[in-house]
Amino acid sequence: MEIILIKPVRKLGKIGDMLKVADGFGRNYLLPQKLAIRATEPNKELIVKQKHEFEAKDKQIREEVEKINALIKDQKLVFIRQTSDDGKLFGSVTNKEIADKLSENVSYNIAHSNIILDKQIKFTGIYTVEIRLHAELNAIVTVIVARSESEAQDYLREQKTETSEDLAESA
């Protein structure tokens, strides 16, 4: 299936790119999400005319996202959970919980589908989590999972000493 992107799509292309994609990917994802349109002759002409409008709209969205990124950047989210003796959680910290807490902290709604977890969070500790804000912009937040507030503060102190040691080594 040939499509024309009307929004930037990570690892696929930018606005106005004409691509050949698998039929299922186009029909089930790109078209319903309004990320692309079919590459018919009328649509090709339309895109040529409206490409500047799409790019201006994308630029405006990117500027808004950069403001949100400034708020999110360097956030530390603390989750207090019950654990077994070896530090394993009864359950896990999900991307939805991270999105809810982050949305609460920055007063901006972050979709849980934008939270990228490398692996499930099932143990106490410090985790780095990536938030996809835009096709070209990601933010990084620190998630701290602990049994108590005092343990969370200990993790924060450890992280500060590690960062100051890293800075001293690089100097």
Curated annotation (Swiss-Prot):
| GO term, biological process aspect, one | translation
Keyword Transmembrane helix appears in the UniProt entry: no
Report the SUPFAM superfamilies cross-referenced here: L9 N-domain-like, Ribosomal protein L9 C-domain
Cellular component (GO) terms are: ribonucleoprotein complex; ribosome
GO terms of molecular function: rRNA binding; structural constituent of ribosome
Q: Which HAMAP family match?
A: Ribosomal_bL9 (MF_00503)
Q: What does this protein do?
A: Binds to the 23S rRNA.
Q: What is this protein called?
A: Large ribosomal subunit protein bL9
- Which organism was this protein described from? Rickettsia felis (strain ATCC VR-1525 / URRWXCal2)
Gene, per the UniProt record? rplI
